[in-house]
Amino acid sequence: GEINMNEEKKEFTLAGKTYHEGDIISIDGTTGNIYDGAIPTVDATIAGEFGRVMEWADKYRKLGVRTNADTPKDTAKAIELGAEGIGLCRTEHMFFDEERIFNLRKMILSETVEDREKYLNLLIPYQKGDFKAMYKELQGRPMTVRYIDPPLHEFIPKTEAEMKQLADAMGITVEKVQTVCNDLHEFNPMMGHRGCRLAVTYPEIARMQTRALIEAAI
């Protein structure tokens, strides 16, 4: 039936029942049907008519299909759904875990190569573990890995509480952290200090990632 929306009250009415903001509904992404409450779900599979069409495509296509994946879980799902490899693994996405981002921020705030390498060495086990798990899921399929690409300002603390936590851990002032964060800000980050430029300025980052990649494969 038709859905009657009331944006002011943040509610809609369907099939004689009114749903309010926060109520749980379930939507079938294939049919578009809406169901009341939370219904049991299953993982998507390549089956039925869709599966048959995909079999036809596989029979005649010449173009290989790879996917973006940055975690072992995403890699496993990609292979399950027929990907022939990983077209792009964006390693910067591997660092946003709370413990990882904290050590990465310490590296960014460090003023010497030795200090940067000290904190980067703490990240190697995480990188190595992720790559090893992804290799296992790929079972010999190819993977293109992109080293840390974004400008470093994307990793810096955003709140005063985060800045204070970082300052306390490194034995520096909050003002020092704020100064570094301000200095890292870029007007046009898409064309700025990123990618290969970042690797030229801080080769120790690329060395850490290269080591993790190779050791995971051994």
Question: What are these language model-derived features?
Answer:
Residues 1-2, 89:
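Short beta->alpha connector loops at strand-helix junctions that form conserved
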Residues 35-53:
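Short, compositionally biased
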Residues 2-36, 112-114, 119:
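A structural-propensity feature for long, helix-poor, extended segments
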Residues 30, 37-39, 148, 157:
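Surface loops and adjacent helix of pleckstrin homology
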Residues 46-49, 56-218:
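Conserved alpha/beta-domain cores
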